[in-house]
């Protein structure tokens, strides 16, 4: 029993960090089990990243419906039902939970560096939209932080195209980034990152945690939780903004979410929204309570307001934010922070093939053109032009994009991490993905003649299938097809010639063969099914055939009375009585539902049964 419990408690998890590296948490290495609380997992992640200002960060996960949830430090991993249902393996995503109003006031450089990585990811994935000139400034500062000062010998033409900063990055933007990068001489990485955050914090969508909801007449809205309050978006336009001091009540019941706001005339106004599910509505309420507590409440009022907000929820749903608030963090003494011996280790960003300046790929019919370029490290790098998509593929991709719900940001960039597809998130070195063979394509071990066919073979198979269908009884049921079929039947009947022959010798041969047959005759063909039309009494047949007149009679010399009367003879046979068995199968029931009787094979005719045989004496 203990072994069975240990298998259930085994836990394997991958934590994706902001620098695109992974932290593996397992039962064997860190001793993390399903009964471990979320605070232990957070401590391992914070220790690995070397964070001291941990209140701004958290770990989230996705359920099977791609709904995101923050890991609750007070609950065990097993209590996160949506997380357990996705694995193993389990995937967590480290990121910023509460965006600081002024990231420049963060005390440690490592904290600002993690904020820089998070905001840069938001811009790349389209969650933080910005204008062309702002995008160029932010990207130039990111290049300065990673590559340092511009060097014409190291940074050759097109070096900016090796990095990705915005969705659908164009060549003109890369040229602007290169020009701005030349003007940033002397800025060290920490200074460039601070300038990056100083520009990003002024953007409208900075730090907005969006939740899709429905308003009146099922209109699509987005509720955004920000450091200053709640914003409402409709059709990518801000239609409302409510500051945290004005929000007096947050309530949810089933899928309905209520936001009560105090107006300037001291009158309260309630705004109602509908979420997609009860789980999504509860998650919106929890995030709203945590944001309200973290950014709004002083130290002595945070716990009381959290308890007050928890009473406004539905029955049985109580949630309390137990961490420090932004005001508490600001009032703490700065004696321990920043740490004197702290060293920030920055990782290189992911690079891509350099953009080709020669439009040679356009003259090759959309075929990929590969070029070799020398990098600064002296190793050759391969760059390939993207093949041209067919109009059908473009139409399908456009239809898929139209099915996505509209949001205040664009999602055209290749997403990674938390915003990947479910198939990409579940990849793991410990749990490799099983390879399935496509039913339409043959495997490598399959014979070649089964996998591939020439054009002649395909045409022959097609003709063979056409002939098979013509021999079958399948038809479309159209009137023209039925008329053609009737016409063919009449034509075939007209070709046949009916000729009268003497059948007496044929019948004698048949009777002689039946007498010669024995039960053990191997040449006798046996049927697996019972024949209902076969008579088992051979002796009765012989007696009847003796009285049958086989010669043809000429009716020309008969009178009218003789023609009207048909002569017949009475023949009596003897045999065992018939055994009747009632069948209750559905097929044997008539319209009234009463079972019908049937005669079994091998039984004789009843005694004194009159067999009335009528034979025509003329044709």
Curated annotation (Swiss-Prot):
Gene3D superfamilies: 1.20.80.10, Phosphatidylinositol 3-kinase Catalytic Subunit, Chain A, domain 1 (3.10.20.90), Pleckstrin-homology domain (PH domain)/Phosphotyrosine-binding domain (PTB) (2.30.29.30)
Gene Ontology cellular-component annotations: cytoplasm; cytoskeleton
One Pfam family linked to the record: FA
Positions with biased composition (Polar residues): 354-385
GO BP annotations, alphabetical order: actomyosin structure organization
Residue stretches of biased makeup (Basic and acidic residues): 510-519
Protein name: Band 4.1-like protein 4
Organism: Danio rerio
Stretches with biased composition (Basic residues): 428-438
Chain residue ranges for the region called Disordered: 323-541, 579-599
Residue ranges, compositional bias (Low complexity): 471-481
Domain of life: Eukaryota
InterPro entries the record matches: Band4.1-like4A_FERM_F1 (IPR030696), Band_41_domain (IPR019749), FA (IPR014847), FERM/acyl-CoA-bd_prot_sf (IPR014352), FERM_2 (IPR035963), FERM_central (IPR019748), FERM_CS (IPR019747), FERM_domain (IPR000299)
GO molecular function per UniProt: calmodulin binding
Keywords per UniProt: Calmodulin-binding, Cytoplasm, Cytoskeleton
Subcellular compartments: Cytoplasm, Cytoskeleton
Function: Not known, binds calmodulin.
FERM domain span: 11-299
Subcellular location, principal: cytoplasm
Tissues where the protein occurs: In adults, it is found in the ovary, eye, heart and brain, but not in gut or skeletal muscle.
């Amino acid at each position: 029993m203990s072994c069975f419990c240990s298998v259930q408690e085994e836990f394997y998890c991958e934590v994706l960090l902001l620098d695109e590296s992974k932290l593996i948490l397992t039962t064997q290495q860190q001793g993390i089990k399903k009964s471990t609380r979320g605070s232990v997992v957070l401590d391992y992640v914070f220790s690995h990243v070397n964070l001291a200002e941990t209140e701004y960060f958290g770990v989230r996960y996705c359920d099977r419906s791609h709904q995101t949830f923050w890991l609750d430090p007070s609950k065990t991993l097993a209590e996160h039902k949506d997380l357990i249902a996705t694995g193993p393996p389990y995937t967590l995503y480290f990121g910023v939970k509460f965006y600081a109003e002024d990231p420049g006031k963060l005390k440690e450089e490592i904290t600002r560096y993690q904020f820089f990585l998070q905001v840069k990811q938001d811009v790349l994935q389209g969650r933080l939209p910005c204008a062309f000139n702002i995008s160029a400034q932010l990207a130039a500062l990111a290049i300065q932080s990673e590559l340092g000062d511009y060097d014409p010998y190291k940074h050759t033409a097109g070096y900016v195209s090796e990095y990705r900063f915005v969705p659908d990055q164009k060549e003109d933007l890369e040229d602007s980034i290169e020009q701005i990068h030349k003007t940033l001489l002397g800025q060290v990485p920490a200074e460039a990152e601070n300038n990056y955050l100083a520009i990003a914090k002024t953007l409208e969508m900075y730090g907005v945690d969006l939740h899709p909801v429905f308003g009146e007449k099922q209109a699509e809205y987005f509720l955004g939780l920000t450091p200053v309050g709640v914003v409402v978006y409709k059709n990518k336009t801000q239609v409302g903004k409510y500051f945290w001091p004005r929000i007096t009540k947050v309530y949810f019941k089933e899928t309905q979410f209520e936001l009560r706001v105090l107006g300037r005339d001291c009158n309260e106004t309630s705004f109602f929204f509908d979420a997609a599910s009860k789980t999504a509505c509860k998650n919106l309420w929890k995030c709203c309570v945590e944001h309200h507590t973290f950014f709004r409440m002083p130290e002595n009022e945070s716990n009381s307001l959290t308890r007050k907000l928890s009473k406004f929820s539905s029955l049985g749903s109580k949630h309390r934010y137990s961490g420090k608030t932004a005001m508490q963090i600001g009032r703490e003494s700065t004696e321990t922070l920043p740490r004197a011996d702290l060293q920030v280790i920055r990782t290189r960003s992911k690079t891509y093939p350099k953009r080709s300046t020669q439009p040679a790929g356009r003259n090759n019919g959309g075929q990929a053109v590969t070029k070799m370029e020398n990098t600064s490290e002296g190793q050759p790098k391969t760059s390939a032009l993207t093949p041209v998509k067919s109009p059908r593929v473009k139409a399908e991709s456009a239809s898929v994009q139209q099915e996505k719900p509209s949001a205040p940001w664009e999602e055209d960039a290749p997403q990674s991490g938390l915003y990947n597809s479910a198939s990409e998130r579940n990849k793991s070195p410990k749990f490799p993905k099983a390879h399935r063979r496509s039913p339409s394509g043959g495997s490598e071990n399959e014979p070649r003649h089964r996998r591939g066919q020439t054009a002649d073979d395909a045409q022959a198979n097609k003709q063979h299938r056409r002939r098979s269908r013509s021999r079958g009884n399948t038809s479309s049921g159209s009137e023209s097809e039925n008329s053609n079929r009737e016409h063919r039947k009449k034509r075939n009947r007209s070709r046949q010639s009916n000729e009268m022959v003497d059948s007496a010798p044929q019948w004698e041969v048949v009777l002689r063969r039946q007498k010669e047959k024995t039960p053990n005759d191997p040449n006798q063909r046996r049927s697996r099914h019972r024949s209902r039309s076969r008579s088992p009494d051979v002796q009765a047949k012989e007696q009847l055939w003796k009285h049958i007149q086989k010669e043809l009679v000429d009716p020309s010399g008969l009178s009218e009375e003789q023609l009207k009367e048909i002569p017949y003879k009475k023949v009596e046979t003897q045999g065992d009585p018939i055994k009747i068995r009632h069948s209750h199968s559905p097929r044997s029931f008539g319209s009234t539902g009463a079972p019908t009787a049937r005669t079994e094979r091998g039984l004789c005719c009843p005694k004194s049964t009159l067999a009335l045989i009528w034979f025509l004496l003329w044709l």
